[in-house]
Amino acid sequence: MKLLEGKVAVVTGAARGIGKAIALKFAQEGANIAFTDLVIDENGLATQAEIEALGVKAKGYASNAANFEETHNVVAEIVKDFGRIDILVNNAGITKDGLMMRMSEGQWDAVLNVNLKSAFNFIHACTPVMMKQRAGSIINMSSVVGVHGNAGQANYS
C-alpha cells in the first residue's frame, strides 16, 4: 500500500510549478488530487491529465484563493466531488517585486492577499471538514525570503 492511498489532497496554486510537483508526488503516493489555480487553462488540464495517468482521481478548480466566499464555495465543491479532504497544501503564491518607495498599495495588497489571506481562507473552509472527519493535515508553504530577505520583496517575505 502506498503512503497516501485513499487520501484526498487539496493543493492550491498547482496548475504548474511547485504546486504541480507537490500534487504529482502526492499522487505517486496514492492520493486523489483536487487542485486549484486562478484559471484552469491548458496548463491546468495538462496537469490534471498527468495526475490521472498515475491512476488516481484528479480535478482542477478555477478559484481566486484570495476571495473568502469563492474559497468556501470551491471547498464545498471539492467535498461534493471527492467526499472528504485529508490534506490541504497552501501553496498559492505570487510575486510583485519592487522597492518599497516605488511599490503601490495594489502591489502590496495583491501579494498579501494571495500569499497570506488565501492560506487563511482555505484553512477556514477546510477546518470544519477535517474536524468532522476527526483527522486532517494542513501544510503551509513559505519562502526562504521570509528568513533571509531579498531586495524588493518586502511584500513577499
What are these regions (language model features)?
Residues 41, 62-74, 105:
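The beta1-alpha1 cofactor-binding region of Rossmann-like NAD(H)/NADP(H)-dependent oxidoreductases
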Residues 99-100, 107-112:
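Substrate-binding pocket helix/loop in short-chain dehydrogenase/reductase
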Residues 54-57, 77-88, 96, 107, ...:
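A glycine-rich helix->loop->beta "capping" turn
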Residues 31-46:
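Conserved glycine-rich Rossmann-like NAD(P)H-binding loop of the short-chain dehydrogenase/reductase
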Residues 3-34:
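Canonical Rossmann dinucleotide-binding motif of NAD(H)/NADP(H)-dependent dehydrogenases/reductases
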Residues 123-124:
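A short, exposed helix-loop element centered on a Lys and neighboring polar residues
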Residues 143:
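Residue(s) in the substrate-gating loop at a strand-loop-helix junction
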